[in-house]
A protein has these predicted regions:
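Internal alpha-helical scaffold of NAD(P)-dependent oxidoreductase catalytic cores
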Residues: 30-32, 158-189, 200-230
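NAD(P)-dependent Rossmann-like dehydrogenase/reductase catalytic/cofactor-binding core
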Residues: 2-7, 32, 181, 186, ...
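Rossmann-fold dinucleotide-binding core
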Residues: 119-196
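Short glycine/serine/threonine-rich phosphate/pyrophosphate-binding segments
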Residues: 20-22, 103, 125-129
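Helix N-cap / loop-to-helix initiation motif
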Residues: 7, 40, 65, 165, ...
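Rossmann-like NAD(P)-binding element
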Residues: 43, 57-119, 127
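NAD(P)+-binding Rossmann beta1-loop-alpha1 motif at the extreme N-terminus of oxidoreductases
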Residues: 1-57, 61, 113
Length: 319
């Protein structure tokens, strides 16, 4: 394993869906040679077109110069041949279906095709791959959980397995941080990792309030965006508790838990929406209605980029 010169690492990304294409774009933008694998050539072509569109948006926002578009696209090699995709990779990042059988099959092939020092990673958001994957040299197996859109969102959760080595963990952390990501290391693969657990805890309570008719989804969203929005750009729950007062949080944590939602099932409201085909942006309606999916997604990405830019400027000014 090459722990030095991580900027020279070759990256193989498996799966050219939404996450895979964005991860490939991110590494290519940062100067890496990237092979992007998808078994369906048509889907691979669509992914490359979307990457070029994403780059165009970043040019419009002033994030990258126009010439970076061609440089980035030239750094991505699309292929439907798995063995070819991973042949010279320093790290392989898997982004295939969240199914145990799929991951078992692909990692078995990776074990055959890759050298013993190639880091094998999964972008799974829900699965404890360490419980069911069997590979030689398990010390090189790790989870790198990116967030959508992966070429924009700063965070990557790096999750260690019981046999993941310190050397591999540090090398992956160095790679990601060197390319500008913020890394949060989780020392045990707990379900949902860090962010999905917190996200679902908030969503469960928000759904509970809405289902009981205490507030509308719109007003709940307004309350969260107008408070968590600005605060959570620079402090997390522990930093926030320090400013509010740990003694205040002690009282809240004593009084509120008995009346908070403790359901262990999916909210009925959500089940009903799925049954009715109200799946969100991709179906045109969820909690809100949407007309032009491409425009809605593009506008959202632009909001995220501009917010990150603004936060970075403030942090630099306040440093």
């Amino acid at each position: 394993m090459r722990t030095e010169h991580v900027k020279e690492w070759k990256i193989a990304v498996l799966g050219a869906g939404t996450m895979g294409q964005c991860i490939a774009q991110f590494f290519a933008m940062n100067g890496h040679l990237v092979s992007l694998y998808n078994r369906t050539p048509a889907n691979l072509e669509k992914a490359l077109v979307q990457i070029k569109n994403n780059l165009g948006t970043l040019v419009q926002l002033g994030q990258i110069p126009p010439e970076a578009v061609s440089h980035t696209m030239e750094s991505i090699y699309g292929t439907s041949d798995l063995k070819e995709a991973v042949a010279e990779a320093d790290i392989v990042i898997e982004n295939l279906a969240e199914r145990e059988d799929v991951k078992k099959m692909i990692f078995s092939q990776l074990d055959e095709y890759c050298g013993s020092d190639t880091i094998l990673s999964s972008d799974t958001s829900t699965m404890n791959i360490f419980e069911f994957l069997e590979i030689s040299h398990p010390e090189r197996l790790i989870i790198t959980h990116f967030f959508n859109p992966a070429h924009v969102m700063p965070l990557v959760e790096v999750v260690r397995g019981p046999e993941t080595s310190d050397q591999v963990t540090l090398a992956v952390k160095k790679l990601l941080e060197g390319d500008g990501k913020t890394v949060a290391v989780l020392n045990k693969a707990i379900p949902g990792f860090i962010l999905n657990r917190i996200t679902l805890a908030v969503f469960r309570e928000a759904s509970y309030i809405a289902e009981n008719g205490w507030a509308s989804p719109e007003d709940i969203d307004k309350a969260v965006v107008s408070t968590f929005g600005p605060r959570y750009t620079f402090e997390g729950p522990f930093g926030l508790s320090d400013f509010a007062g740990v003694d205040v949080y002690e009282r809240l944590a004593t009084l509120l838990p008995p009346v908070l939602c403790s359901d262990t099932e999916c909210p009925q409201m959500v089940k009903d929406m799925v049954a009715a085909g109200k799946l969100g942006v991709k179906s045109g309606e969820g909690f809100y209605r949407y007309r032009d999916e491409a425009k809605v997604r593009r506008d959202r990405d632009m909001r995220i980029v501009k917010t990150i830019q603004a936060v970075r400027r403030v942090n630099e000014e306040m440093a």
